[in-house]
Design a protein with these regions (language model features):
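All-alpha RGS (Regulator of G-protein Signaling) helical domain and cognate RGS-like helical scaffolds
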Residues: 46-51, 64-135
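Aromatic-residue-lined binding/catalytic grooves and analogous aromatic/hydrophobic interfacial grooves
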Residues: 38, 42
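Acidic, low-complexity proline/glycine-rich segments
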Residues: 1-12
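Alpha-helical scaffold segments that form or flank carboxylate-/histidine-based iron centers
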Residues: 18-32, 55-80, 148-150, 155-163
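Conserved small/polar residues in nucleotide/adenosyl-binding loops
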Residues: 178-184
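Extracellular structured ligand-interaction cores
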Residues: 128-130, 140, 160
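Catalytic Cys-His active-site segments of thiol-dependent hydrolases/isopeptidases
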Residues: 143-146
């Protein structure tokens, strides 16, 4: 199966008023995500994984002790992560389905507590990675975080919400030059 870079389900500038500028989206989707697709397709050619599903490739190539050296896993997994990411957000505020709200309240005590836990997971991810709301194999909801391109598929979990905490997802919109002091000529 060839990896395909999906079109965004909204205009490239649709998230600007929510903190993700058109420039960030162009870099994130059109450059970073596209690179995962292109690299993944090149690495998959002629391998046993070439005609497998994304999930089969992710599960079959995941090895926690050698993730950093596994180009197929990293590129395919990051492609999967980003395909989920683009679908999980949008420009319009949509109410949470009552079934999900009830499950979150049951699992975390309240929606606000879930939001706190989710934001904390993203903020405390050391280095690059993702934070997730997942449905575990036993049906319970959990907030997790994963390093690099690792995702819930690796652990038999279902991703309900994911947040990319790699620098490329926010660095353009969070750069502040106010702390810089330029040298002056003597």
């Amino acid at each position: 199966m060839s990896l395909v870079l999906s079109e965004l389900p909204y205009a490239i500038d649709a998230l600007a008023e929510h903190g993700m500028s058109k420039e960030t989206m162009e870099y994130h989707h059109d450059i970073h995500h596209k690179a995962y697709v292109d690299n993944g397709n090149n690495l998959l050619k002629g391998t046993e994984w070439e005609n497998k599903s994304l999930e089969d490739i992710i599960v079959g190539t995941y090895n926690a002790s050698s993730v950093a050296q596994n180009g197929i896993f990293n590129n395919v997994s990051q492609h999967w992560n980003h395909e989920q990411f683009w679908q999980m957000m949008g420009p319009s505020k949509v109410g949470m389905p009552s079934e999900l709200e009830n499950a979150i309240t049951e699992s975390f005590g309240s929606v606000d507590k879930f939001k706190e836990d989710f934001c904390n997971a993203g903020a405390t991810q050391f280095g690059s990675g993702w934070c997730w709301l997942v449905k575990d194999k036993d049906g319970s909801l959990k907030v997790t975080k994963t390093e690099n391109g690792v995702n819930p598929v690796c652990f038999g979990q279902t991703a309900l919400l994911g947040c990319d905490v790699w620098e490329h997802s926010y660095y353009i919109d969070s750069v502040s030059y106010t702390h810089l002091t330029l040298p002056t000529k003597a």
